[in-house]
Amino acid sequence: MSDPVLVVNELTVYRETYAAVQNVSFTVPAGMDTAIVGPNGAGKSTLIQAILGILPRRSGEIFVLGQALSPKGRLPAEIREQIAYLPQNFLFDRRIPITVKELVGLGWDRLGIQLPWTGGRARRHAVQQALTQVDALHLRHKLVSALSGGELKRVLLAYCLVRPRRLLILDEAPAGLDVRSESEFYRLLHQLKKEQGWAILQISHDLDMVRRSCDRVLCLNRTLLCQGTPDNSLTPENLSLAYGSEFVRYHHAC
């Protein structure tokens, strides 16, 4: 078995005066989709932000592709570029007349490396290939401000694809999509995981989707309550620990 893409070891992160995440340890293997589930306020977004180096950690270790995150949350540039992040909300000024192909092209440019072919044929090919992989090539000349929610999510996946990646992190990225668009989004994720060997770490409130689509699940409520396959982890006992017994009764009644 190959080495895990992400290793989190005894991680504790504080929000002001309280431990929002306490003594959490897990790994994210290559080619697998790992979901983080738990109630509001459980520390899911805090955990993601610590992994990304946005929030400082009180204690513990984080390794990406074998490289340790520094105490200041930094990784070597060549490792940092192996991580793609899709937030729940993508905010931009809709008055900016940027097209889909221009936005995806920024994913190629954003390191600021001046290569001989930057802006040339290799860049155009990478943008076209990324849009093709997410079935969005037909949108390339469309303004980003004119995209539907489902179209925008596909374009943002293309932005992540335009350079090689090893780890994709999503903070409820499908939130706000209709059922059809959400299903298409997860179909694309499954395809990319299979074809690219991506390790995926995502926050989700949709337990049915987690059961259908994810390989592993982490049940979080400040501490890690359980981890494993969805069938082994999303039991009534574990869900009651994470969410409370009222949630479990309601969820099973639906």
Identify the meaning behind each predicted range.
Residues 52:
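Helix-to-loop junction immediately C-terminal to a conserved catalytic motif
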Residues 60-72, 77-79:
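Conserved ABC transporter NBD signature motif
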Residues 105, 120-139:
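Conserved ABC ATPase "signature" region
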Residues 168-172:
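Catalytic Walker B motif of ABC-type/P-loop ATPase nucleotide-binding domains
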Residues 204-205:
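H-loop/switch region of ABC-family ATPase nucleotide-binding domains
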